[in-house]
Amino acid sequence: MFSKSLILRNYFSLLDSKLLDLWGSALKQIARGWGMLLLSMCLAGSVMAAEPAKSTTAAAAKKPVAQAQRNKAKAKTKTKAPVKARVDTRPSFGKVAGLHDVSDELSLKSSVALVVDQETQEVLLSKNDSAVLPIASITKLMTALLINDAQLPMDEMITITQDDVDTEKGSRSRLQVGASLARGELLHLALMASENRAAHALGRTYPGGLQVFVGLMNLKAKDIGMTDTRFVEPTGLSSKNQSSAKDLVTLVQTAYREPLLRDLSTSDSHVVDVGRHSLIYKTTNRLINNPSWDIGLQKTGYISEAGQCLVMQTKIAGRKLIMVFLDSAGKFSRIADAERVRRWVEAKHRAVIPQT
């Protein structure tokens, strides 16, 4: 038989073993629980850490796209700056030469002026009349004179080409390359509206070409007694087209003898059909529509080197006069100078009517 003490010792050993097993199992469960908890915390931390990174990455990706969209919208709404015509701010040859410092009794704004009685050749007013200066579009009077002299068919169609586009001054024109007009229409626009492409096309299509035409311009000037004059092209855009007031009186007298030139230069407006649309041109001389003036022939001109220019045949106080104004200082001063001369002639130089 087992002793009581042995049984008790075995019982407690077994109990200790069971307790150890239970304790170990409990520890394992606790460890497993803590492990899961730690793992969950780690995973949660990773997710939390990843979310800002993901948001930052997405924001970073969206930022250039949003900026591009804003730039695109801005580009759409941005007003395009208007294209400006070339502005030439060079002083006139007359100003450089000091011609504006010369005074006259009428305080004219033109540095050169000459008023001559067409019938008697009496000089009523003279200011720097021998100075040789650029004459701008006054040139077109000589261009018109040659076209008229040549007796070319006025109904012949002429097409504007790239050669007629102004590359010297960058001046604008409503006559587009490819437009076709009759020679007579081009002559009308050149004289009345000072259309540069029209004048150039007239010279370019002259028999023999532009070079021959310019040579004939200079020959014609010499033939009619213009000794201070030189032409290099038919529009007046070049400052190398030069003359004096004395010579321009001669040119006006010669051109005035041609009825067609008188009629076209004093027209106040003209409509031309170009393709499927019409263009309305108006005179460059506002005195044409002034009832106080009786103008038989006229031409205006302007480039910066020449200043504002004006030549006219007109009748004032019973006298037929030729007026020349070159290198006028302002946009309207050539007209104001003409008005001063008209009032002066009416007051002091009226025609003397013979007693019968």
Enumerate the language-model features and the residues they cover.
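Hydrophobic alpha-helical segments and their boundary regions
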Residues: 24, 29, 34-35, 106, ...
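Hydrophobic alpha-helical segments, especially transmembrane helices
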Residues: 29, 33, 141, 314-316, ...
